[in-house]
Amino acid sequence: MEINRSYPCNPGNYAVMDDKVNKYIVIHYVGATGSALQNAQYFERLPSIGASAHFFVGHASEGGTIYQSVDPKDRAWHCGAKVYRHPDCRNANSIGIEMCCHKDAQGNWYFDDETVEQTVQLVKQLMAEYNVPIDNVVRHYDVTGKLCPAPLVDEFAWLLFKQRLEVPAMGEKTGDNPSSWAVDHTEWAKAKGIIYGDGQGNYDWQGPVTREAMAAMLHNFAIAYGLEKED
């Protein structure tokens, strides 16, 4: 994963640490319509803002570019408060990720799909690097009660986001044995010629499905049921 580190945060906006242990990853939204680049440059340029984040994840228009503002080994000021909802998550033991956002005509905040996908991949990388369990990926809302990140304060939206963290990243090894509930379905798909393996008996049943793989499966389905002739 490419991360742009060209705009380090002004030293006046975070605290250097020697022994930080990252136990949590905290998800935020920027709360304005600026780009990740603009945010990274803002925190680089101005001292004494009293706030910071480790990463900014950009809009689709900037390719979902990720900017590292503060090194995860240092303490960014992203979830501090006088009163906390969370019993343990603090600036001193967490990594803060800010997602860039948009506001619609009704005043509702939302994320580009690419911003969400890039955030998911970044979180998964950080989870692996710092051994952070999925239960310790939290919202700013969970830590302090602040309505942040606004598009993910809704519990169902947050559940969907968390579920994406459980899907193996592209290139990650996955189990080739289907889940017990799916055995009949997978055997049927193999028998009908809808899903093909790699020629060595491997089907990667629990791997992620790309759009091109889905297109191939639909095409095979059409051929298997005579909806289209095989070339």
Where would I find each of the regions flagged by the language model?
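Short strand-loop junctions, especially beta-strand C-caps/beta-turns
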Residues: 30, 100-102, 200
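Short, solvent-exposed beta-strand edge segments and adjacent coil->beta transition regions
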Residues: 92-94, 200
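Structured segments of extracytoplasmic/periplasmic soluble domains
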Residues: 33, 43-46, 58, 72, ...
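Solvent-exposed, acidic/flexible segments
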Residues: 20, 48, 90, 108-116, ...
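Basic/polar, cationic surfaces and motifs that engage anionic cell-wall
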Residues: 1-8, 14-19, 25, 88, ...
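Short, solvent-exposed alpha-helical surface patches in non-cytosolic proteins
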Residues: 170-231
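N-terminal catalytic cores of peptidoglycan-degrading enzymes
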Residues: 1-90
